[in-house]
């Protein structure tokens, strides 16, 4: 079953309305579950949401995007702030927010030699340039083993 067919099935089952456009996987999405494009009506979905959270949560993400889709084409408020959107989302039991990823986002761990303060960073820092914010001691990178 293709993604577009799956979205069509969810649309008919949960909304009772057909989905007439295309749905695509978008690997570039990092923090969002999906996107609706009013200009041409297509939907993008994050494939990691299905892999990490399973089919049940992904179906709720599809419902969320279909709320945007159906409200837009009905000429009603389709933004997150609109009452029509909030009511329809609650009615179909869709997700308002995407669950956070279980993967650790910190790649580099540093600690102060003097006071032991621990720092976690996504990006490397120049140890010759930066010092501890508490005691101005020298920082060392901890091994990731």
Curated annotation (Swiss-Prot):
Q: For this UniProt record, give its keywords in alphabetical order, as a comma-separated list.
A: Cytoplasm, Metal-binding, Zinc
Q: Name one GO cellular component term.
A: cytoplasm
Named cofactor requirement(s): Zn(2+)
Q: Which family does it belong to?
A: Belongs to the SprT family.
Q: Name one GO molecular function term.
A: zinc ion binding
From what superkingdom does this record's organism come? Bacteria
Compartments in which it is found: Cytoplasm
**An example of a Gene Ontology BP annotation on this entry?**
response to stress
The SprT-like domain is annotated at 4-140
Keyword presence, Zinc = yes
Q: Which residues bind Zn(2+)?
A: 64, 68
- NCBIfam families in the record: PRK04351.1 (NF003339)
Copy out the cofactor comment: Binds 1 zinc ion.
Where's the active site on this chain? 65
**Which named protein is this?**
Protein SprT-like
